[in-house]
């Protein structure tokens, strides 16, 4: 089904089996503020590496598995079946880095990250710059062979677990003043500090602190690419991660439909199984239909990446996939919680966890409203035929 070949089915099987290993740990995480014991989390990390499910977007030239975009979607889809962020051990470093990393970056950060020895985080978003990054206030001042970085970043996901951060800032001097540039910063560099760590709704094991960079000095070898390239890396990351968001939403919706259907078949109300009630049937039928449509869209978008379709067309298609799949998963979670009734409001219930965790998929990596603007912009410029 879906035209998957033997290699696709094998990577999908491995990912599904691994997700099935993670799912029993959800209750443990839920009972401990979202976190697993360190030794168990480490075993999951090592298992992902062992199975070839780590850094799946990395080419073989840097030690990655060299999977196709479709195969990467298949892996992340299975990870999406797991709550509490436990499948974040299926980490993917930035897809654009191997092409632009200088020798220093390659040896110090890139290769160890692909091997699973280091972890990155992203210091991009600010209080006044979320989906629209053109309003960044963070600055980068060239000072001899160094850059001095200043800025306060919000939602720096997994900062507490990270070894280094990608820091986006506006250049203040030189021929490219006003451009945005991207830098690699070790999290223990003097001047980097956590301002506060707010409590969030989802994936409690991964904190999302506000982090200040105050007079942080880094050598020019920490500049990613050139002073002209900063926004291009962000756009490339958005294309990739929006598709992966869509993939994870497929997995979440599939598990919700499966577990809710099983519950409705067993639950007897008024002398017959709940699944015989037409209103429940309608909710499950709508959910399954929307999942089927979202999966077809997401897989086809991945195939268009593998086929080398124009990047701006891909930008719109990835936005369409994220928009449709994330909103689909939110509707499915809402319906499934309703079918479970009071049980669906208990933390031990899968519908409660997904209802809470899936909400962010319509916000991060560009809110749904931004996706609609991107799609509409490309429609106006290219017409519908090139996009669909």
What are these regions (language model features)?
Residues 1-82, 86-87, 103-105, 112, ...:
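Alpha-helical interface subdomain recognition
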Residues 64-67, 131, 222-227:
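Cytochrome P450 core scaffold surrounding the K-helix E-X-X-R motif
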Residues 92-101:
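Helix-loop "lid/cap" segments that line or gate small-molecule binding pockets
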Residues 113, 128-131, 155-158, 171-174, ...:
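Short Gly/Pro-enriched turn/cap motifs at secondary-structure boundaries
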Residues 116-124, 168:
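A short, Trp-centered hydrophobic/proline-enriched beta-strand micro-motif
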Residues 135, 188-219:
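Flexible, small-/acidic-enriched active-site or ligand-binding loops
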Residues 145-146, 150-195:
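A short core secondary-structure module
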Residues 212-236:
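A short, charged helix-loop
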């Amino acid at each position: 089904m879906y035209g998957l070949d033997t290699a696709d089915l094998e990577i999908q099987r491995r990912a599904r089996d691994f997700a099935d290993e993670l799912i029993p740990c959800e209750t443990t995480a839920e009972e401990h503020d979202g976190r697993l014991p360190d030794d168990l989390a480490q075993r999951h990390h090592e298992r992902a590496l062992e199975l070839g499910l780590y850094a799946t977007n990395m080419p073989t030239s840097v030690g990655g598995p060299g999977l196709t975009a479709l195969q990467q979607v298949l892996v992340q889809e299975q990870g999406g079946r797991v709550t509490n962020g436990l499948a974040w051990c299926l980490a993917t470093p930035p897809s654009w880095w191997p092409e632009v990393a200088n020798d220093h970056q390659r040896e110090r950060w890139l290769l160890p990250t692909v091997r699973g020895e280091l972890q990155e985080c992203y210091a991009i978003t600010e209080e006044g710059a979320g989906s629209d990054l053109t309003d960044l206030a963070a600055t980068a001042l060239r000072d001899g062979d160094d850059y001095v970085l200043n800025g306060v970043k919000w939602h720096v996901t997994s900062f507490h677990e990270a070894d280094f951060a990608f820091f986006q800032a506006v250049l203040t001097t030189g021929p490219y003043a006003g451009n945005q540039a991207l830098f690699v910063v070790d999290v223990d560099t003097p001047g980097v500090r956590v301002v506060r760590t707010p409590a969030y709704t989802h994936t409690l094991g991964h904190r999302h602190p506000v982090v200040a960079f105050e007079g942080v000095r880094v050598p020019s070898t920490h500049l990613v690419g050139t002073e002209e390239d900063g926004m291009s890396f962000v756009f490339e990351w958005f294309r990739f991660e929006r598709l992966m968001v869509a993939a994870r939403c497929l997995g979440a919706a599939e598990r919700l439909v499966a577990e809710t259907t099983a519950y409705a078949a067993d639950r007897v109300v008024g002398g017959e199984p709940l699944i015989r009630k037409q209103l429940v049937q309608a909710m499950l039928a709508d959910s399954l239909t929307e999942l089927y449509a979202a999966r077809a869209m997401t897989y086809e978008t991945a195939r268009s990446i593998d086929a080398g379709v124009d990047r701006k067309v891909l930008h719109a298609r990835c936005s369409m996939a994220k928009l449709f799949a994330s909103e689909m998963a939110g509707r499915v979670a809402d319906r499934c919680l309703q079918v479970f009734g009071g049980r669906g409001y208990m933390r031990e219930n899968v519908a409660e966890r997904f209802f809470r965790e899936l909400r962010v998929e319509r916000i991060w990596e560009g809110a749904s409203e931004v996706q609609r603007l991107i799609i509409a912009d490309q429609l106006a410029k290219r017409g519908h035929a090139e996009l669909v």
